[in-house]
C-alpha cells in the first residue's frame, strides 16, 4: 500500500518529542486517556497498550489490570521504563520496542487492545488494525482514541490549516471515518460498539470494536 507516512520518520519525530511530551500533550489528551483507561479496567484481564509512549497512562490503570506496552520510539519507551521502575508498577508485564503492524504476540493473547493517537501515525492503518484484532481474544475489545477528519464546517477548515504542522509531528491529518467503516467491512470479524467525540472540540473520537467470538 502506498503511504504518506514513513515508519522511521515517525520514530524519529517521537524521539524528538520524548523529553517534553508529557508537558506538551499530557493535559490535551487527558480526557481521552481517562475514558480509555476506565473502559479497559472495566474489561480487566490482560491489556495491550499500543503506542504506550512515555507510559503516562500506566500508573492510572487499576493494579489488577495486567499491562503490556509497545512503542516504536526507543526514547519514549525509556521514559516509560523509568516510570515503571520509579513507581513500582508490578502489573506491567513488559514494555518493548515494536512495530504496531507486526506485533510479536501470539494470536488471541489479550482481553483488550488500547491504541491512543496511533492509527493516523502509522504507514498502513488497515493492516495495523488487522494485527490488533489478531492478538485479541474472541469477544475482546479494540479501544481507539484518534483524530477522525471532519467532512465540513469550521473544524474542517481548522484541520486543513493545521495539516502541515500535523505532518511534521508524524500524524496523518486526513483520516475520514469512511476508512474505518471500509476496514471493518473488509475484515468481517469485528463489530462497532461505540463512537463518541472527545474534547477538545470533538477533534478526537473514542471508538470501540468487539472481536467476534466465532470467526
Question: Which residues fall in each region the model found?
Answer:
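Conserved alpha-helix/loop element of class I SAM-dependent methyltransferases that forms part
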Residues: 27-44
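A short SAM/SAH-binding and catalytic strip from SAM-dependent methyltransferases
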Residues: 112-124
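Short glycine-centered segments of the SAM/dcSAM-binding site in methyltransferase folds
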Residues: 46, 66, 139-141
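A short acidic, Gly/Pro-enriched loop at the edge of an enzyme's catalytic core
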Residues: 101-112
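N-terminal, positively charged/glycine-rich alpha-helical extensions of SAM-dependent methyltransferases
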Residues: 1-16
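C-terminal alpha-helical "lid/dimerization" subdomain adjacent to the S-adenosyl-L-methionine
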Residues: 25, 145-200, 205
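A short glycine-rich, Lys/Arg-flanked "PGG" loop and its adjoining helix->strand segment in the class I
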Residues: 126-138
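Class I SAM-dependent methyltransferase SAM/SAH-binding core
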Residues: 48, 53-102
